[in-house]
Amino acid sequence: MVRRSGDDRAWRIGTDAEVTWIASGTSEGRTITSAIPPMFEAYATVVLPHDAEAWDRHDRAILALLGEQSADQSWWLGYLDTGANDIVFPDAPKVTLYTGWHYLLVEAGAEQAATWRQSGPGPFWNGALPDLMFPADHSWLLSTLWDDAWTCIGGPAELVSKLAGHPELEARLVALGEDATPPDHQAP
């Protein structure tokens, strides 16, 4: 358990046990399974915005839809340790995912996802959302890989359909095996 400055709560830091299901289900490549295990009903990519106002609307839309899906449970929030981005609890132990990337993983919720990381100019993206989020029941997973200009999401078909149809989100449905790179984007 760790404490955040100005916060009187203690927060549980995740271990490799909380992300084994992600690590064992993802593989390198350009398909959605480079970020999301092939265990969900539906998948989508959501392009990251380019300006601050669009970021705020994007983040609010994502959190509202994910919150509708998983309001009554805790969420795991993952912050990628790039050396430049805010990872919230910099001295806490990290987990390793994907191709050796280190994440701080903390059990919290939608409110903390919206407020712990400050949005604004930064070396990578400007949004406040964590790079990795999933609820305790693993019913959905959101992952923004450090070198992509989009977010990958897997979950129930109804949730993914709502994300893909939301007017504030530039999202598209993606099938397993399909290149997840959004149109007009280049995979790293």
Regions picked out by a protein language model, each given a short descriptive name:
Residues 98-159:
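Amphipathic protein-protein interaction modules
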